[in-house]
Amino acid sequence: MTGSNSHITILTLNVNGLNSPIKRHRLASWIKSQDPSVCCIQETHLTCRDTHRLKIKGWRKIYQANGKQKKAGVAILVSDKTDFKPTKIKRDKEGHYIMVKGSIQQEELTILNIYAPNTGAPRFIKQVLSDLQRDLDSHTLIMGDFNTPLSILDRSTRQKVNKDTQELNSALHQTDLIDIYRTLHPKSTEYTFFSAPHHTYSKIDHIVGSKALLSKCKRTEIITNYLSDHSAIKLELRIKNLTQSRSTTWKLNNLLLNDYWVHNEMKAEIKMFFETNENKDTTYQNLWDAFKAVCRGKFIALNAYKRKQERSKIDTLTSQLKELEKQEQTHSKASRRQEITKIRAELKEIETQKTLQKINESRSWFFERINKIDRPLARLIKKKREKNQIDTIKNDKGDITTDPTEIQTTIREYYKHLYANKLENLEEMDTFLDTYTLPRLNQEEVESLNRPITGSEIVAIINSLPTKKSPGPDGFTAEFYQRYKEELVPFLLKLFQSIEKEGILPNSFYEASIILIPKPGRDTTKKENFRPISLMNIDAKILNKILANRIQQHIKKLIHHDQVGFIPGMQGWFNIRKSINVIQHINRAKDKNHVIISIDAEKAFDKIQQPFMLKTLNKLGIDGMYLKIIRAIYDKPTANIILNGQKLEAFPLKTGTRQGCPLSPLLFNIVLEVLARAIRQEKEIKGIQLGKEEVKLSLFADDMIVYLENPIVSAQNLLKLISNFSKVSGYKINVQKSQAFLYNNNRQTESQIMGELPFTIASKRIKYLGIQLTRDVKDLFKENYKPLLKEIKEDTNKWKNIPCSWVGRINIVKMAILPKVIYRFNAIPIKLPMTFFTELEKTTLKFIWNQKRARIAKSILSQKNKAGGITLPDFKLYYKATVTKTAWYWYQNRDIDQWNRTEPSEIMPHIYNYLIFDKPEKNKQWGKDSLLNKWCWENWLAICRKLKLDPFLTPYTKINSRWIKDLNVKPKTIKTLEENLGITIQDIGVGKDFMSKTPKAMATKDKIDKWDLIKLKSFCTAKETTIRVNRQPTTWEKIFATYSSDKGLISRIYNELKQIYKKKTNNPIKKWAKDMNRHFSKEDIYAAKKHMKKCSSSLAIREMQIKTTMRYHLTPVRMAIIKKSGNNRCWRGCGEIGTLVHCWWDCKLVQPLWKSVWRFLRDLELEIPFDPAIPLLGIYPKDYKSCCYKDTCTRMFIAALFTIAKTWNQPNCPTMIDWIKKMWHIYTMEYYAAIKNDEFISFVGTWMKLETIILSKLSQEQKTKHRIFSLIGGN
């Protein structure tokens, strides 16, 4: 606990208003520096609507009482380090008090925080005590601003207390309450408040408590501060059995890495360490751990020195202030009082400047990211994270305990036991592995795994490390390795080479911290319902990632395509489609005797036996250096659990693969592949025959589905096999949580099977990879797409009040809604009714425009780049793209795409290869039951017809096609042509180019059968063939034929479909041209569109330009049409008709601002025509030579747009000072962004001259009032 393991610290302070962001930041800094367990603050001046403004990192539990007006207001802040459990809260509606009852470490505590009004304070407090009499007990503390002294010593004038105060003291005495400060300091003359009008000191802030609590009060003191005109009071309260609830594990502060001085100091330290300590007597493993210890100490020292330097002046002034106030309280003196006021003002200015810098840095970060698909937007919509604090747990007896010590013991013992069950039956492991055939890597592949680790591999891994992630136990972050890459990589290389030779890791590589993440929707009082995630040291992760990258190159040879989890190029929806195909096949079958089982594994990653894993790797042919390093990794790993912020005692990890290690998923898949191979090879476990293929399994890591015929025999043999596998591997299944679909025509047999199978029989649905698999495929829409619509409606309803513009809302749709929808489209591309898309579009548009009338037409927003890069997704086209992309898999004809060949239909599986860019089969029948592929085929043909494309004979028609096979060309000839020339007919050459394009083509002629050559020549030189094949392929054809990977496939098809189904829309830029009575060329329109995208890196700034160009703003003319009224005159009161160009430019009340802008341009020596198209649309004259100043002009113009929009429908004239303030805001934000992004030179080029002109136009009073000071010049 804060400060000690035996007491808590409580602070009380009147903050005198928190409506200023600077004041709130200063309060946060002060509270963090004091680090109390509980902080009571008064006079927040926040209203009921402003409660969200009071946020302090590390003090998430904040209880507030606020009124409707900006006065009074109290709050109690409880540190995250304090295990406080509230049981009752009472608030005053006017915000004068709040009472919170609760407990800390099972000791009861009641805190009443009071702000008494200036008049009648004693009577008010007395009334509060009367109202809350039943809640005040022997565990009560009352504190706050009482606005009255309680004793003679509480005033510097020694004036007697009045009658009301005497009555209050009497009431306190009757309820066994005492002034704790005065009791512990009976003769002290320290005060908390100075009254300037009366020139007197007084102690009107108090901590009052029950007499029973006095023995627990360790000490209390008054703390001078410069946040307000009050001093704070601090109380230390003893709590029995108080445990340290937070660990003090060191973690590198990444901000230090950005400090140039710190960076140079650390570079020198790293260089000196290795030069001094690298020798033959010290192993690289020990040297590396010693290096990290030295670095840790150096960072701590540098951070302490930096903080000391930063606070030296503040500490000096604070000491002076404390001494002067002490003297002033004893003997008042006017000159001393002036000195105190001066020091307070100086301290306030220093703190304000520091706070302002922090605020601007923070705002700059948001300035760059706000409304973009980035973290701020994600935070706005993310679900409230499950609380990681574990306050209750079921112990081994099944009883719920809240005792922190017992919770720690229960959790630690459970996970210690979980990871301690190491099997020693090595012979049984060998026997099991020898029973089944496993794939093996060849010598060349093994040598590839065992090649020496290189520096380039280490650099590539360091560059790819995700940033802003929690580090391992050593505290070093990914940013540390990236910042000192040049210095660290040479030694890391030597370290890894030493590990390769010796098979020994540094001790720190074995360490890990385990954090427990609650499984969603599970009972969190059960210790097994948490997911243990290992936080490993980054250096260990670098080594493991190198190993993972190497094995990943060969993983497809070792792992069957049934497994799609963590395998490159494989996707989860492959197995969903396969499962749907199997279910459809069973639905169609007349004789049903099948079962589909979704197997739930019990702590799968944590129970895998490490000896079995190592033996499996060896069985696959993996040996040598690669296996030696893996053996070393699993030699003696340890972990400590971080529970409620406290690090528990470490224990060994004898089983399992670490969740959080980059190598673990692949190692787990390799182990589970042994079981998968065994299931496939066991003939007594009969799968389901789909055409020529027997389908038994689908896996995504440990999520397994098994498809079986003859359930009684097959399921029993499956369970027996899994039981045998469990004995050697540690893998176990939870049969009660495993679910199954049972299909049988005979009710008696079905009942028998249900009685013998231990699985839960599902009657309607089974959830698999986020999709509801249904017992009958006809229910797929009902169980998946209808709930999806409901979920989206609920989400958008939850998000309706988020502080986000329409542009940000479009990005939320793209970031949070579109991926969900596409995943459903991918997994279940069935025919959807139009009502689904209508409802989906209606919901998203309602969210984007926040229940209001749309300002910009959907057709304009949906067109790419028409809205400055803010493109509204067209869900129907995404659906069409997802459905059609199956054709790419047909053309590729990959062996791994079993899901694509096994759909029940009248088409034979081998025919899919000949569907697109091939000769149509006359007798082809899809059949009425074709659920997915027929729908793809119909969409494919429809799009080809739309494009007027020949879908059958094209430049991408394959040599191994029906066109060539129907010529009775020998397979050997086809193979020879493919090996020597390519896979398409165009590669052979058509017309006069037939087999004469290259010397290799001519040489291939001699290798093929003469009769085949004659047939081929006849076909390839035919006029019809030449016309249809010898042409430039279209973009549509290239999408399906030229890309070897399906990465980005949907986006490519979608972008092409947007062009195909493009609709004519009103061009807003042409409307501007009409309003301005002029013509814009294509170049002008392109310039305006480009300007929307490039005018600023901040979307918050770009949004104004987008809104202006897209004609977003309502005008009197437009409103008159909407409301069907006759009043279309300018809202500013000039009397003219309020068209859009009038409101932005022509209005005589707006013109003075634009003339001021042009005066600034002349001061910048820029001669630009006084033309509205330039500031409003960014269309500069073609002969404008000062292109380098366009960035400067753009900032000025956009600031002017903001200023005009601010008074859009008000009878006010936009002022020059408002325009300058907006410019300065943009300037300040870009300044901090430029420093952070190392773009300061270009920033200076844009702003330097303009900064000088702005400062020259303002008086010193204006500069001070609006805090406008030079940032580039620094004066």
Curated annotation (Swiss-Prot):
Catalytic activity annotation: DNA(n) + a 2'-deoxyribonucleoside 5'-triphosphate = DNA(n+1) + diphosphate
Positions of region (Carboxy-terminal segment): 1096-1275
Record domain DUF1725: where: 1242-1260
Record note on what altering C1130R does: No effect on binding to RNA
Impact when changing C1147R: No effect on binding to RNA
List of residues binding Mg(2+) 1: D600, D702, D703
Reported impact of D205G: Loss of endonuclease activity and reduced transposition efficiency
The protein's Enzyme Commission number: 2.7.7.49, 3.1.21.-
GO biological process terms, semicolon-separated: DNA recombination; nucleic acid metabolic process; retrotransposition
Residues annotated to bind Mg(2+) 2: E43
Cited function: Has reverse transcriptase activity required for target-primed reverse transcription of the LINE-1 element mRNA, a crucial step in LINE-1 retrotransposition. Selectively binds and reversely transcribes RNA with a poly(A) tail consisting of at least 20 adenosines. Also has endonuclease activity that allows the introduction of nicks in the chromosomal target DNA. Cleaves DNA in AT-rich regions between a 5' stretch of purines and a 3' stretch of pyrimidines, corresponding to the sites of LINE-1 integration in the genome.
UniProt note: domains: The FADD motif is located within the catalytic core and is essential for reverse transcriptase activity. The C-terminal segment (CTS) binds to RNA with high affinity in the nanomolar range but without apparent sequence specificity.
Additional facts recorded: Long interspersed element-1/LINE-1/L1 retrotransposons are present in more than 500'000 full (6 kb) or truncated copies in the human genome. Most of them are inactive but one estimate is that 80 to 100 of those elements could be transcribed, translated and active in any individual. An active LINE-1 encodes for 2 proteins translated from a single RNA containing two non-overlapping ORFs, ORF1 and ORF2. ORF2p is described in this entry as a representative of all ORF2p potentially expressed by active elements. ORF1p is described in the related entry AC Q9UN81. Insertions of LINE-1 (L1) retrotransposons can occur frequently at CRISPR/Cas9 editing sites. The reverse transcriptase activity of ORF2p mediates L1 insertions into CRISPR/Cas9-initiated double-strand breaks (DSB). De novo L1 insertions are rare during genome editing by prime editors and by cytidine or adenine base editors, consistent with their reduced DSB formation.
Subunit structure of this chain's protein: Interacts with MOV10.
Full protein name: LINE-1 retrotransposable element ORF2 protein
